[in-house]
């Protein structure tokens, strides 16, 4: 499972990239989507690589982000562990995060919004417009790097 975070806005973005971001449920900057690791999604991520940060997060960090940022798909109810127990197959955020990483379920299957609306990173971006190879935030991240970014945006 990959976490994809849109970091750049729509200025000078081609229509094909904009459509691909929409297919990934990324409509605004600082939104995050969780997608399975399939060939189709790999191609989509490659196409939008200059506008997003992506990588596989750890269970602990994903659990923290879900606890703070997950929303119900159909209502304005606050999602907490009580809500999770009553409306999903999982008792807590750790179990949900584990199932998401192992690709056993999706947020939408559990009645949750497929988009996590994140806070801008505390402390700012490290060279937002540059690829990770040049010390920036755009592109592929290893687990530690994506965890650091998600923690800053929790």
UniProtKB/Swiss-Prot annotation:
Keywords: Ribonucleoprotein, Ribosomal protein. One of its GO terms (molecular function) is RNA binding. CDD domains: Ribosomal_L7_archeal_euk. Residues 114-139 are annotated as: Disordered. GO terms for cellular component: cytosolic large ribosomal subunit. One of its GO terms (biological process) is maturation of LSU-rRNA from tricistronic rRNA transcript (SSU-rRNA, 5.8S rRNA, LSU-rRNA). Pfam families: Ribosomal_L30 (PF00327). The keyword Ribosomal protein applies. SUPFAM superfamilies: Ribosomal protein L30p/L7e. Residues 119-129 have a biased composition (Basic residues). InterPro entries: Ribo_uL30_ferredoxin-like_sf (IPR036919), Ribosomal_uL30 (IPR039699), Ribosomal_uL30_arc (IPR005997), Ribosomal_uL30_euk_arc (IPR035808), Ribosomal_uL30_ferredoxin-like (IPR016082). Part of the 50S ribosomal subunit. Belongs to the universal ribosomal protein uL30 family. This is Large ribosomal subunit protein uL30. It comes from Haloquadratum walsbyi (strain DSM 16790 / HBSQ001). The gene is rpl30.
